[in-house]
Structure formats: C-alpha cells, structure tokens
C-alpha cells in the first residue's frame, strides 16, 4: 500500500470520525462525542494532513464557561 493510498484512507476515517463526533454531541451523547473527537485527534496526528481541529470552538466555549 502506497503512502498516497494510506493518506486517502486516513482522510476518509478523519471525515467519518468528525461526522460521528458531531452527531453524538447533537444527541447529548457526551461520552461518545469524546470518544470520536479523540479518534479524530489521533488520526490527525498520525496522518500527514495536519487539519485544523474542528472542535476548537467547542473547547474555547467550555473554557469561557468554566471561568
């Protein structure tokens, strides 16, 4: 399997993990959201895509509310 093929597989897996994370959050399944968000972060780290974290705004809102 070539690096290009691996990148394509990881890109699809990243998209799926993001979709599942947002879907989980929209249904108040917070633990499941955390699971899929963590999967996304892990896949993003091992891929060469370096995508920006789609959950950053959620984290920033949580930090504001915490204070």
Residue ranges of model-derived segments:
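Short, charge-rich, low-complexity alpha-helical interaction segments
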Residues: 1-8, 60-67
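Short amphipathic alpha-helical heptad-repeat segments
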Residues: 6-18
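Short, charge-rich amphipathic alpha-helical segments embedded
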Residues: 34-59
């Amino acid at each position: 399997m070539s690096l290009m093929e691996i990148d394509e597989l990881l890109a699809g897996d990243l998209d799926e993990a993001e979709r599942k994370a947002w879907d989980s959050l929209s249904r108040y399944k917070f633990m499941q959201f955390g699971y899929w968000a963590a999967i996304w972060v892990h896949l993003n780290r091992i891929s060469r895509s370096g995508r920006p974290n789609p959950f950053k705004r959620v984290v920033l809102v949580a930090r504001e509310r915490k204070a």
